[in-house]
Regions:
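Juxtamembrane intracellular "pre-TM" segments in multi-pass secondary transporters
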Residues: 2-13, 205-241
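Helix-loop boundary and gating motifs at the non-cytosolic
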Residues: 6-64, 236-268, 272-275
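A membrane-interface helix-boundary motif in multi-pass transporters
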Residues: 49-50, 168-190, 381-412
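Helix-to-loop junctions at the C-terminal end of transmembrane segments
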Residues: 69-82, 285-299, 383
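Structural signature of the two symmetry-related core transmembrane helices
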Residues: 86-100, 301-316
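Helix-loop junctions at membrane interfaces in 12-TM secondary transporters
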Residues: 102-115, 318-330
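Glycine-rich segments within core transmembrane alpha-helices of 12-TM secondary carriers
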Residues: 146-168, 367-376
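Multi-pass alpha-helical transporter architecture, strongest
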Residues: 192-203, 405-430
């Protein structure tokens, strides 16, 4: 058995991980307080629970679809010398400014528009952040560093979130109204994200790149076209990206829709927030554990285990009707969320050329964001089409929202089958 050794992080690796701590504060807010805040705006605007869940799902779908379109283009452009850091910084600033601006919007529609812009900035920045990984660390350390990014992102993002949660829950004790508390929460998160980005901007230097070769814009589209052709010929990469499209769909959809799902089912708001806070604490050690497991066990095997466990989690969520079940769901998600994300990222990083990481991670982003578009859209559509209906399954009365979540089971199953084929082919090639 291989001995697992602790590694000492370099300054660049620490700076890279710190960005995960910064942007994770935003996504934690998106998965907890923001859906509840939008619910109050939607209720004031006359929307019922099913329409609220549908419009929230559609907003997530629009943002992910936009990133799926622009991500590969920007990723390929960023592979040119000197382009990666400036484009990364621009996307980060769009997310930070959008986050800060969400607190000053009037009405549910304006809020959704600003939310989409902030989510596009966040998701786009991750294309370049992920593409930095092969330059930030070595191939041998990639699984561990990737896992630590997610792990410390989960636990570090709790710091600003607790401040925001205390302000929202108890702000009235010090004369701060609910609306003002949310405005301040958006500002706290935006500042945290911006500050945590600065060390990476200072230390990162693009070491793997392609030369401009003329106009970088026209070269970008030419190389993107060539990459699509190459991926179709490299069956092991093509199958992996196709599998990733499906299995990561369920992961991202659960992250995006968890609070909205619980709110639509009428579960206690405070209980939902505390349960999702628990997810962060559970995800921290479990993400690190998966990074260490990858030194002893095959990465492909670990990803397969995560996919199967997520399939079981989704089946459990279909029958969720009470608060305690949501707490169990939160713990189960925390156990596997960071592992499957980190290992999927490093798995691709090991089978692609480092100097073209931007374009390949851009393609990965098409798959990830395109999948998230599929998942949130399916849930939104099923929820809207079955508005007001209830279903009796195994003696339980389930709401239409429960049935909508069940669509993810099929998507996980397809992803598992495709990944098994891709991993078998990758093992043959290596």
């Amino acid at each position: 058995m291989v001995e697992v050794k602790k590694i000492k992080l370099t300054a660049l690796e620490r700076s890279w991980i710190l960005y995960d701590i910064g942007n994770s504060a935003f996504i934690l807010l998106v998965s907890t307080l923001i859906p509840i805040y939008f619910y109050s705006l939607a209720s004031d605007g006359g929307l019922n629970e099913s329409l609220y869940l549908s419009y929230w799902g559609y907003a997530g779908s629009v943002s992910t679809l936009l990133v799926a379109v622009i991500g590969p283009i920007c990723g390929t452009l960023a592979d040119h010398r000197g382009f990666k850091k400036p484009i990364f910084m621009a996307c980060m600033l769009l997310g930070v400014l959008g986050c800060a601006a969400m607190g000053v919007t009037a009405g549910w529609l304006a809020f959704l528009i600003v939310f989409v812009l902030a989510k596009v900035g966040y998701s786009s920045s991750l294309v370049f952040y992920d593409a930095m990984l092969p330059e930030v660390t070595t191939d041998e350390r990639m699984n561990t560093v990737s896992s630590m990014g997610y792990a410390y992102g989960y636990i570090g993002s709790v710091i600003p979130f607790i401040l925001c949660l205390l302000l929202v829950q108890f702000g009235d004790k010090i004369g701060v109204g609910a609306g003002t508390a949310m405005v301040v929460s958006f500002l706290i998160t935006a500042v945290w994200w911006f500050v945590c980005t600065q060390p990476l901007l200072k230390r990162y230097r693009q070491t793997a790149f392609v030369e401009h070769g003329g106009n970088p814009v026209s070269s970008t589209f030419r190389r993107l076209r060539d990459t699509f052709r190459e991926v179709r010929q490299q069956k092991h990469i093509f199958l992996y990206l196709l599998a990733f499209f499906f299995f990561i769909d369920g992961v991202y959809t659960i992250i995006d829709m968890a609070t909205a799902y619980g709110t639509a089912l009428g579960l206690d708001t405070t209980g939902l927030l505390l349960a999702l806070l628990l997810t962060q604490f559970v995800a921290f050690p479990c993400s690190i554990a998966f990074g260490r497991f990858s030194a002893k066990y095959d990465t492909g095997l670990l990803i397969k285990i995560c996919i199967l466990c997520y399939t079981g989690i989704t089946l459990f969520a279909v029958f969720l009707v009470s608060q305690w079940q949501f707490w169990v769901l939160a713990v189960l998600v925390g156990m596997f969320q960071g592992g499957i994300q980190a290992l999927s990222r490093s798995y691709l990083g090991k089978i692609i050329p480092a100097e073209r990481s931007g374009e390949y991670f851009g393609l990965m982003d098409i798959c990830g964001k395109g999948a998230s578009f599929l998942g949130t859209t399916l849930i939104a559509m099923v929820s809207q089409l079955t508005d007001g209906q209830s279903f009796h399954v195994f003696g339980l009365e389930l709401q239409n929202e429960n049935i909508a979540v069940g669509t993810l089971v099929v998507i996980f199953a397809i992803g598992f089958v495709l990944f098994c084929k891709a991993d078998k082919l990758n093992n043959t090639i290596s």
